[in-house]
Amino acid sequence: MGKNLTKRSEDYSKWYNELVVKADLAENSAVRGCMVIKPYGYAIWEKMQAELDRMFKETGHQNAYFPLFVPKHLFEAEEKNAEGFAKECAVVTHYRLKNDPDKPGKLMVDPDAKLEEELVVRPTSEAIIWNTYKNWIQSYRDLPIKVNQWANVVRWEMRTRLFLRTAEFLWQEGHTAHATKDEALEETELMNNIYAEFAENFMAMPVVKGSKTESERFAGALETYCIEALMQDGKALQAGTSHFLGQNFAEAFDVKFATKEGGLEHVWATSWGVSTRLMGALIMTHSDDNGLVLPPNLAPIQVVIVPIYRSEEQLDQISEVANELVKELRAVGVSVKFDNNDNQKPGWKFAQYELQGVPLRLAIGPKDLEKGTVELARRDTLTKEFVNRSEVVEKIKALMTEIQDSLFDKAKQYRNEHITEVDSFDDFKKVLKEKGGFISAHWDGTPETENKIKDLTKATIRCVPFDRKEGAGECVLTGNPSEGRVLFAKAY
């Protein structure tokens, strides 16, 4: 129950871990670093998937599916990409097991079943996809290709946390091929904007759009655009990335096309993705010491109706009203559950739905039947009011928008209050220690300074904001000339 959660102010990390498990979102599995996403958690992910999938298709993208395994020679074809992911790769070396002759009932890897070439379990799919695109692209008429894949990937993480960092996770990865550099850059920007729109309109999570520094870019990319969000503990979270790959992968896999003019050129590429890490972002942006707080646009259950009764006769009367409400709410697009399960008492249900972040709860008892009212409770504000039965549906419709907007405004206010401009390294360290959040500071543009600041403070450059204040200044660490401010933060 919510009351058993560790308070955020006492131990934010412990609060998060407890909430994920107690709200029935996910749990650890028998495989170290891998999670089980439980039905309620998966229902939220499905809502995310559905909205993103719609947005992708509305911008001309199609879904496809590519193999989980990547032959090692393909994986290493694009050198920077291979080097960047090498230490995180799981590798298949054999293709069967056999009975262990020394241990009856046990199995062993068959030493005679060694693969001729090792297979990398995909940490990302550029290699297998670009090897495929080579067969799909001959002419400018075959372009652009705009494909998305919903899949699982494996990156062998040692220190894992549910949703935020797991060895296996679910994600979508888009891979596009274009005839021109400008078209590929437009695609990179478009997808980053789509991620920002999704984060703000559906997750009610304000984000900063920007580009990564060279050392923070995706391995093999010429540019990485990103959206960065701020969690309630003052740490940043990278919520989505979109990469301009130039012609690197086309050159690595020799993907060329015949131009309109009759020449032969390498195609231009992008890739972009978000993952179940968004679940962690959603949880940490809005939730409180009582449990999960979900924006209505992503809540699997937007309204729950709980009957309060002492007899079967009362339950029958309440059920009649509740079932009418269910029909009326569903007719206007509201997701609603009537919880008439008699295995648990109303008090337990109230606490459970509060813990699981259901935006609105309706309680109907015998007195409500007499008065023609229902009790309506908001999860975000924990306030209650009585509403006339005839006005409930319109009230709920209005509240869906009001709650969504209110959660965004609250998160945006917190974010804005935690963007601090500093001009000295002493102030930088002080703000980082005492306040956290984003620190807007001048940087001299060198990876050496970037790394030194990271070593000294554990803060990284989250992004160079697209809307940053241009203007010369002095680097916060070295005093060398700076072209403009960037955003630093400690991050997940």
From Swiss-Prot:
The UniProt entry lists the main location of this chain as cytoplasm
Give the reaction(s) catalysed.
tRNA(Pro) + L-proline + ATP = L-prolyl-tRNA(Pro) + AMP + diphosphate
Q: Tell me the keywords, alphabetical order.
A: Aminoacyl-tRNA synthetase, ATP-binding, Cytoplasm, Ligase, Nucleotide-binding, Protein biosynthesis
SMART domains noted in UniProt:
ProRS-C_1
Q: Which GO terms describe its molecular function?
A: ATP binding; proline-tRNA ligase activity
Q: Where in the cell is it found?
A: Cytoplasm
Q: Name one GO cellular component term.
A: aminoacyl-tRNA synthetase multienzyme complex
A GO BP entry:
prolyl-tRNA aminoacylation
Pfam families the UniProt entry points to = HGTP_anticodon (PF03129), ProRS-C_1 (PF09180), tRNA-synt_2b (PF00587)
Q: Which CDD domains match?
A: ProRS_anticodon_zinc, ProRS_core_arch_euk
Query: Known EC number(s)?
Result: 6.1.1.15
InterPro entries tied to this protein: aa-tRNA-synt_IIb, aa-tRNA-synth_II, aa-tRNA-synth_II/BPL/LPL, Anticodon-bd, Anticodon-bd_dom_sf, Pro-tRNA-ligase_IIa_arc-type, Pro-tRNA_ligase_II_C, Pro-tRNA_synth_II
Q: What does this protein do?
A: Catalyzes the attachment of proline to tRNA(Pro) in a two-step reaction: proline is first activated by ATP to form Pro-AMP and then transferred to the acceptor end of tRNA(Pro).
What the record says about family reads:
Belongs to the class-II aminoacyl-tRNA synthetase family. ProS type 3 subfamily.
Quaternary structure and interacting proteins, as annotated:
Homodimer.
Q: What is known of its domains?
A: Consists of three domains: the N-terminal catalytic domain, the anticodon-binding domain and the C-terminal extension.
Q: What is this protein called?
A: Proline--tRNA ligase
Q: Which gene holds the coding sequence for this protein?
A: proS
